[in-house]
Amino acid sequence: MRIIVDADACPGKDIIEKAGKENNIPIIMYCDINHIINSDYSEIKYMDCGFQSVDMAIVNAVKEGDIVVSQDFGVAAMCLGKKAYPISPKGYIYSDKNIDRLLFERHLGAKVRRGGGKTSNHKKRNKEDDERLYGNLIYLIKNCDTVLESEELKIKNEE
């Protein structure tokens, strides 16, 4: 098991590293060359600035059982297909039970914006997001064998 992070604009990198260090889980952070990330624990991999280059590097690198931190629903969907455990930087766990809805909502939002409409802005990150991210990372680390089929997952995403 590894923790792979889509680190370009990922809040909570310190929380991810804390969970990884405490459980002796290696962390690999992927970002493009326009971002500088310093870490004494994580391995940092820099990609070209090309369209989706970081996303594709993550999907190509991920293995079954890895935890992937990304706010990109497309990356999450592809990682689910590889039997990995995607989680958002706000701590929401993606699963086969919620990814289709999330992708559909993303599609609808893009369609509205292309038509000149506006969609709602995301809420600012808060302390609860940090706590959810840490708690659900630990939950995934400890329960990765059964988590994606679990009814408990619904509760973890609502906390």
Regions found by a protein language model. Give the residues of each.
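Nuclease catalytic cores that cleave nucleic-acid phosphodiester bonds
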Residues: 2-159
